[in-house]
Amino acid sequence: MSKTIPLRPANEQFTDSQWQAVFDGDENILVSASAGSGKTTVLVRRVIEKVKSGVDIDRLLIVTYTEAAAREMKERIQVALQKAMNEEQDPERRRHFSRQIALLPTANISTLHAFCLTVIRRFYYLIDIDPVFRMLTDETETLLLKEDVWDALREQFYAENQEAFYQLTANFSNDRSDDGLTNLIFSFYEFAKANPDPEAWINGLTQAYEVGDQLGESKLFQTYLKPLAVETLQRTLQRYEEMVTLTEGEEKLQKIWYLAQNEKEQTKQFLQFLERNDLESAYNLTELLSFDRYPTVRAEELKPTAEQAKQLREQNKKALNDLKKQLFTLSPDAMKQVLKEATPIVQEMAHVGKQFMEAYGAEKRLKNLVDFNDLEHYTLAILAKNQADGWHASEASVYYREKFDEVLVDEYQDINQLQESILYWLRRPLSTEGNLFMVGDVKQSIYSFRLADPTLFIEKYNQYGQGKEGKRIILAENFRSRKDVLDFTNLVFSQLMDERVGQIAYDESAALVHGFDQFSEAADYSTELLIYEKKATESVEFPELQSPELLIEDKTEGELYVTALKIRELIDQNFLIYDKKLKTDRPITYQDIVLLTPTKKNNLTILDVFKSLEIPVQVNDAQNYFQATEIRTMIALLQLIDNPYQDIPLAAVLRSPIVGLKENELVLIRLANKETSYYEAFLTFNQKMEPTMEEAVVQEKTIRFAESLEKWREQARRNQISNLLWTIYRETAYLDYVGGLPVGKQRQANLYALVDRAAAYEKTTFRGLFQFVRFIEKMQEKDKDLAEPVVLSEENAVRVMTIHASKGLEFPVVFVLDMTKEFNVSDLNERYIFEENLGVGIRYLQPEERVMYDTLPFLAIKQVRLRKLLSEEMRKLYVALTRAEQKLFLVGSYKDQAAMWKEWLKVGDVETLVLPAENRLQSKSSLMNWVGMTLVRHQKADEYQQEVVVSNVPQVKKHPANFHIQWFNEEQLRAAIQQLQLPERQAEDLAEKAQLSADKINRGLARLSFNYPFEVATRTTSYQSVSEIKRVFDDPDNKEIGKIEVREDNTIQAQPLIVNRMIEGDLSKPKFLDTVQAPSAAEIGTATHYLLQLIDLSKQPSYEEVRAVQERLVENKLILPAIAEKMNLEQIVAFFDTALGKQLIQHHQTVRREQPFSMLIEAEELIQNYPETTQDDLLIHGIIDGYIELDNQCILYDYKTDHVKGTSPQAISEIVERYRGQMNLYRRALQEATHKEVSHVYLILLNGGVIIDMQTGNVVDFIK
């Protein structure tokens, strides 16, 4: 029962709920504190009131999520205690407060890890651990240690030659490496160790694979897969009902009505099978699933209705096809067989993973190392003891339960299961008065990568809300933001977040309530959506190569220019914000603005764009530390000191200011000895006895450097690396040198940080320069860049940080960038997925068929993880929006406005407050799509789009939120930038970025026009590519070469020789001079080859899988979106249904794709009319699209995406003649490389839809 709460004084600033959170007690309490609700203030006040009531500060355990939060908490408590003591008149109470201030430095206010360390230091004897250990805190050191242990253990397993281990390796690795198995074991370890009882978790891994005879009755299907399928089918039936209603009674729409009725009955039958758990019938139905052609409607007045019905039907087709792929790729019997065969692999995974866990633990104990995970497990082992009748509190647990009057936990939503177990043994049992006080906001739980478990918060939220085991207090008032920001956030999340996606209902108790009423209304503070239209981007024109224009390379730059221009507008127009410290309005400054990004990958682009528009920007976590010139130079020098026989580091150091050689001087060193390594050439050059005058100047520098290098190498063997670095800095004056460069203080800070990094490394278990270099290389390899050291923190600059980094902070104006970035669900496409409660789901590689199958646990865990992943994305959006105090901007990009509205209007007709789960659970969606779907139902959206169907749900239609949408294209950005008054330097930067000067081009053309006097030798180059040779067959007249015929014997019959360099004679027109940037056939062909190179041949590729590969290529900027749109994916998929395509899949292990080759051929052998007196060789270079290597033969194939005039015998004959020479060269090169006969040569015409046997010249198959 709760204790009596004192009445809140009239002048008290706290709200009723805050007051309750401060004083309520005698039972466990969960405070659900929304963003900006003052939870830290409440927590501090609660501590102070406890102290005022006579509780000593050291009888409280206060757990924070970060060390910074712990420091802030101590500081705020000290200030409050000092204030209380100063205001107190009673001498006894003043002494009490004074004593609390004295106790504060040693009070238990810390992270849970720090408290665990205290427990272990005190009770280490209970678990027989050496109390003298070192904390293993460096991620890279941890990774290297894991790799060393795993390498040794893996070799041991290989030596044992057990079939089970080889099968495990084969299932998760490929023919190039077993990195897949390494990653699996490391992930296994992380998930196992996050569990309170790792051994129990490991022992239960195979349970999910033991489903019995009735697959439909299994817990996995019933709990995780059936609800998804039923929900999808119910929503599909609703859409068919809408189709029927739309078309009913209209004779000209009767065919559509019948189609909707038939497909609705088919869907209803599907649903009935699932509800009866009849998976066999459901599977058989999906095998017969087909969709008739949609009827054509010619009546103009009915076309809008027909189109509306068609859109509903398209959504249904996608939903049913997706459901089939998700759940019914295998029959129930086949799935049971797969589970049976996959079980031994999971058993071996558990065995190997457990062995690694033990070996890694033994290695850490041997070296007296303890990591954060060990701290938690050791603490749990100290607090709880396992006896015959279960777990009981140990003497340590009893001690702490008696010691602490209250356990206060901040950021409780980020606790994991292991940490929850520790808290359980620290708090008092439920049979007594509760003493656990938890504060957090599950809507801000965004640390799943640290295995945080928000369900722990949610369970208590629901239980305590019903008065079970504790009390729930909700802090809804937001004292941070304007009502404009809060209304917009509430509008969005009332429609997005519920138990299904987000994991908690965004109801009235969760909604944000405006609590700060001091803001003025000096400007429009409505949320703005800034949309960059990619389609509007055209090639940049350069009239007479004199007028520099803005060149936007991709959507990222487009969005950043939109953002930068909006910031310039705010600054230039003196946009007013309310200053809470000054308590008045003032003009905005750069320092008031923050850019929130999903990741750090675009930070360097942000720096470039903002610099070009003269906007100061601070990106302290740019993750470009290793890319800084001064750091790259020093790392190259350290690599050289470790091993001088490294050409690239040697050249880098010689070219750097440390030695100061020029390019031509580097050439002199190479000429001293052309046959050996560059270092040996360097030594030879230094020993040259009679150098030329030029060589003598260089030699003076190189000899001096060689002496320094030898001295540093000697020092590295006997001194610490940090001392070595100081020696180098001092002797080269490099530290002073970089200080004189632009941003000199930052560069010096970077070099200081390298010394700190070296000093930290020397405290690890690794030693020596070689290991340090490996250490640094591993950091670079794993993208664990050293954070760029912060030089200035209070400068007037726009700040950039990730959404994760912004948590707990607030800013007057917030721009959320890259909002249309597609959700990253790549982890769900791996061969394994781990989950805290369900264990592991694997994809099973059938060894004979070499086909990968999704197991039932994989399908179930994939759905669970997808919901969790998208729920966290939704919570990240909540964190991002609630960082804004006064003005919020959301930035994204779409192809054009039509594409944007198409995405947003998918839910325009939904009549429920919360949007359907299927729309929110689209993995290929984005944050902006989510936001857009909530806005189109608001009456404000009608101002921007006439097709908007304003929702009849009153909470949406007339919501008080306000927003504006603005669109920008490249032309508008260009015009806006030209109007800016940029300093000369910035203008020059833009010009340099956008334009090549005319005189530079003309100088290049003049060089290309130079006539070399030895004409005969120039007529044939010594290097030819097969593609260049091939081009001359297309149109010889345009290539300035006579008619050429390549014979079967690989010789070329040419007309009188004009030019024997078989390439185009004209310089290609620069891309920036093009007025239209339509993709060329060559660009489409190159992109198609990229795609074909990456398609997984271990199984029959589907359209969706091929599309996914294409999307990855676009995302990684290997192909442009405009080119992707022109690629014929249907033909690519259809090719794999041909006999040749199936042959590639059947022999996928011996298929070689994109194989480069070089072949030396005598010129007179290739070109008959070549002068006999000239003995020259041609180096033929090419890339073979692919071949199948069989036991005694090879099958060569080549893709072509050329436009084909038809498939008539004459057209086919022309194609065969056009490519015969190229294919003959490929065939010869392949035979020489493999020493095997090439039995077949196939030309695959993807656009023509045929496959040609080049030896017979006949069409052998059709691509349909």
Curated annotation (Swiss-Prot):
Its EC number is 3.1.-.-, 5.6.2.4. Residues 12-482 form the UvrD-like helicase ATP-binding domain. Residues 520-808 form the UvrD-like helicase C-terminal domain. It comes from the Bacteria. It catalyses: Couples ATP hydrolysis with the unwinding of duplex DNA by translocating in the 3'-5' direction; ATP + H2O = ADP + phosphate + H(+). Its cofactor is Mg(2+). One of its GO terms (cellular component) is cytosol. One of its GO terms (biological process) is double-strand break repair via homologous recombination. Heterodimer of AddA and AddB/RexB. Belongs to the helicase family. AddA subfamily. The heterodimer acts as both an ATP-dependent DNA helicase and an ATP-dependent, dual-direction single-stranded exonuclease. Recognizes the chi site generating a DNA molecule suitable for the initiation of homologous recombination. The AddA nuclease domain is required for chi fragment generation; this subunit has the helicase and 3' -> 5' nuclease activities. This is ATP-dependent helicase/nuclease subunit A. It comes from Enterococcus faecalis (strain ATCC 700802 / V583). The gene is addA.
